[in-house]
Amino acid sequence: TPQGHYTLAPLYDVMSAYPVLGEGPGKLSPHRARLAMAVRGKQAHWRMRDILRRHWIGLAERHGVIGMNNESAADIIDTLAVRTPTVIENIRNRLPPGFPHPVADSILQGLQRAADRLLQQH
C-alpha cells in the first residue's frame, strides 16, 4: 500500500480454480466460484464472475498504482490484456515435459477469457 503495508493479492485463487471450474460431478460452477480474498474497490467482490474491470481499476487507484511511465491503472490493464496471447504462447513453450495438458489448458484458456473480458468492458 502507499503507507508501506503489505496486502496479499487475490490472484493466487485464479490458477487453482480454473482446473476445477465447469458443470457436472467434481466441478465447481463458474457462477459460484469465489476467491479466498476479495477484490476491494468501494465494496468487496468475492465471486469471480462479479469482478469487473472497474473493480480492478478501483483497487489499483486505491493503492496508488501507476505505471513506470505514469500510465493509469486502465492503461496497465489494457496492456496486460493485449499481451496475454503472447504470454500464453510463451508459457506453453516453457511447460516441462509431462506437464498435464488438461491443467495447463484450463488455466491458460481461463486466463485468455479473463483478458478478453477486461478488454470488452472498456
What are these regions (language model features)?
Residues 1-122:
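Anionic ligand-binding catalytic core segments
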